[in-house]
Amino acid sequence: TWEMVRSELPGRAKMDLLLEFDEIFGLDLDKSAAENAVASGITKTLEVRGGHREQSDYAAADEMRGQLASDGYIVLDTAAGTRARPKTPLELRQEKWASVSSSREIESYLDQPAELDFTFVLNAYGYPSDVKRCIEGMLNHTGSHSVEAIVIDNGSTDGTGELLEEMLAEHPELRVVHCDHVIGDAASKNIGLKQSRGRNIVVLDGSAEITGNILDTIAEQLSDPTVGIFGPWGLSTPDMQHFHEEVDSGDADAMQAYCMAFRREEVNNVGLMRECFRFYRNLDIDYCFQFKDKGLRVVADSSLPLVRHEHRQWTELDDTQRDELSRKNFGRFLKRWGNRPDLLLAADAVGFESHQQFHH
């Protein structure tokens, strides 16, 4: 749908296709939305502009069109008369900065040699103060390492995009990719992975704040070729059904994505994140198993200097929404990995589907 909207098809053809799609989606696109209403002052301006056009004073009419555009309106001149509508959030964003609609539009640098020590990747799903705190934590604790921070503005409408543009001017090591709509958690992070130029990648959540030197420890851990993923908050499970936050140090079955680090070269080995995970929950577990499937370890160290703040993606939803989205994502994980107890640490690990014990 998004590719069609952004295509070179005539407007009428796009509208016909959207209405046909909407027979399935049920969004009532054929009904004029209240957002398309214009203020009485705009209606008066259109009448004055129409008078200029009738008198062939097109210079004055064009000047008024430009003013209406600056005020946030699209003016449409047709044989039946002139109409105007407010610009959509998408149109307003596209006027401010270049944006993408999917990770497929992003060039991958993964086949090119690393140019830096570290790449931070942040999926910015809104909440500007959280994003600012997270970025400052990254950039204030780089030590002697060369770093870049890739922040994906994931369709935000709360001023996050504007904040990121301001921070770009202050931080040359910051790179920003704007998305014209919410593309999902995995797709957003894949943009960062594909664009990364650091030897090691650190994926952070906006709720996490770095408060000290984490990069020396990460570099040391990832110098071990047997370690695939390293981070502070490890998980364990005996049966693929319940992952417990109880691994403070050493090997774990999975790592929570509040902070997870891995070598950039391994992305070509294990693949990108699965973009069927639009909601964040269980994506981290799924990606860890992509590493474990290649014989790589997941290692935890809870002493890393990070603080977890309120996780907005969790608290902004009610219990029903959280449970439904989490359940669907866990089903995606189980469908792929549920019968792979051989990837778990426990000697008597049990697969979800067969519930047959596997012995290492």
Please name every model-derived segment.
Residues C179-S196, E246:
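Glycine-rich, basic loop-to-helix element that forms the pyrophosphate-binding segment
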Residues E209-H244:
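Conserved donor NDP-sugar-binding/catalytic core segment of glycosyltransferases
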Residues E136-S146:
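Short, acidic, metal-binding catalytic loop of nucleotide-sugar glycosyltransferases
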Residues D153-L163, H181, D205, E209:
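A conserved acidic beta->alpha catalytic loop
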Residues A186-A187, F243-E265, N269, Y280:
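A recurrent flexible, glycine/aromatic-enriched loop bordering the glycosyltransferase active site
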Residues I201:
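Short aromatic/hydrophobic "clamp" motif used to bind/position activated sugar donors
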Residues S101-A114, G228-P232, T237-P238, A261, ...:
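C-terminal, non-catalytic tails of nucleotide-sugar-dependent glycosyltransferases
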